[in-house]
Regions:
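Non-catalytic C-terminal accessory modules of carbohydrate-active enzymes
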Residues: 201-341
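Carboxylate/His-rich catalytic cores and anion/metal-binding grooves
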Residues: 32-44
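Alpha-helical transmembrane segments of multipass membrane proteins
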Residues: 18-19, 90
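Short loop-to-helix capping motifs
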Residues: 25-26, 99
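Catalytic cores of carbohydrate-active enzymes
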Residues: 44-64, 72-238, 334
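Short, small-residue-biased leader/transition segments that mark boundaries at the very start
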Residues: 1-7
């Protein structure tokens, strides 16, 4: 994309953190910190009272209209949410490089943006953001923007607001026949917001079919790679990863492989927390790390869940079996773990 598409341009800020979380190497954050700061400062010059109003919005969102610019969700809502996200990443970076002044300054800026976002887009009487579309509600939920300021001006999470907005999100998905209406931008936030709140069964329902919008519909028409539009007959590219955001759910939730919550360790310590869903009986995946290949497969039959795990040398896996609260910590080697399902 050209400049001024915040949802794409913030890759300057996100990629160094993805690298850090994956490899435990913070060198890119330190190297590109000045660039991150300049980009945020640029966005600040384009904002009007904390609101950004340019970009593509939820590009290629789904509905009874020609795909393209955002139709279901206001462009300023999408742009401002990503503005907030960018600043929050910069705050993390400022802390890591030891810049106390920037930490305070950009924390204050982030709070101002969140206040402006909620003032502009939150309908408190209905607990809906923007138009109430799936992207409108999923973005602030994902970014934990459902907050209120206390008497001292400090922002804290509003659990009641979060629950009401999330309930509205679920209702909208169900009202559309367990189908999404999000686009290239909103897909990830919808899927991950549902996953973070334990709605894995709903995610499975949303994609385990052969209708549009869905991957099965593309397969019906012979697609061997993801197509740019949910209905490949509509033209556009037949080799476009744009709608591939479910891949994150496949690895992080369905198979359950994800890095430790202590990012500095990269995958020297990692989590395996599989989420069996629906009538799915078998899942298998592998993930290449600096330390070797993580192999995971599971079966779910006759009320028994069987997990096979291969842990690379000099690494540790923290395994959460379905329905069990206490994890099992295992060292390098090959294991089979069984539990009731």
């Amino acid at each position: 994309w050209s400049s001024d598409v915040c949802s794409s341009d913030l890759s300057l800020v996100i990629f160094p953190f993805m690298y850090y979380e994956t490899y435990g190497d913070d060198s890119l954050i330190k190297k590109y910190y000045p660039n991150m700061r300049r980009y945020v400062d640029y966005l600040k010059t384009r904002a009007d009272k904390g609101i950004l109003s340019f970009g593509l919005g939820d590009w290629y969102d789904y509905g009874d209209f020609r795909a393209g610019f955002s139709r279901n969700t206001p462009v300023p809502l999408v742009a401002t949410a990503h503005y907030y996200m960018t600043v929050m990443y910069l705050v993390k970076a400022a802390k890591m490089v030891g810049n106390d002044f920037d930490t305070r300054y950009y924390t204050s800026l982030a709070q101002d943006i969140m206040a402006a976002f909620n003032k502009c887009f939150l309908h408190k009487d209905t607990a809906q953001y923007g138009t109430g579309s799936q992207c409108s509600n999923a973005l602030p939920l994902f970014l934990q923007m459902t907050q209120n300021a206390d008497e001292q001006g400090n922002y804290q999470s509003d659990a009641d607001l979060h629950e009401k907005v999330f309930t509205n999100l679920i209702k909208d998905v169900e009202a559309h026949g367990n189908r999404l209406t999000t686009g290239d931008v909103g897909n990830r936030y919808l899927i991950q917001t549902l996953a973070r709140n334990g709605e894995h069964e709903l995610i499975y329902k949303m994609f385990n079919h052969e209708e549009a919008p869905g991957y099965g519909f593309q397969l019906k028409f012979g697609a061997t790679t993801l197509t740019e539009q949910w209905d490949p007959r509509q033209g556009s590219s037949w080799n476009h990863f744009m709608m591939g955001q479910i891949d994150e759910w496949f690895f992080n939730s369905l198979v359950g492989i994800r890095p430790s919550t202590t990012p500095k360790q990269g995958y020297q310590k990692f989590i395996i927390a599989p989420q069996p869903v629906g009538d799915l009986k078998y899942v298998k995946a592998s993930y290449e790390t600096l330390y070797g290949t993580i192999n995971v497969d599971w079966t779910c039959e006759n009320g028994t869940f069987t997990l096979n795990v291969s842990v690379p040398v000099n690494t540790t896996a923290v395994v959460y079996l379905p329905g069990e609260k206490e994890p099992k910590e295992i060292q390098s080697g090959t294991y089979q773990l069984v539990c009731a399902k």
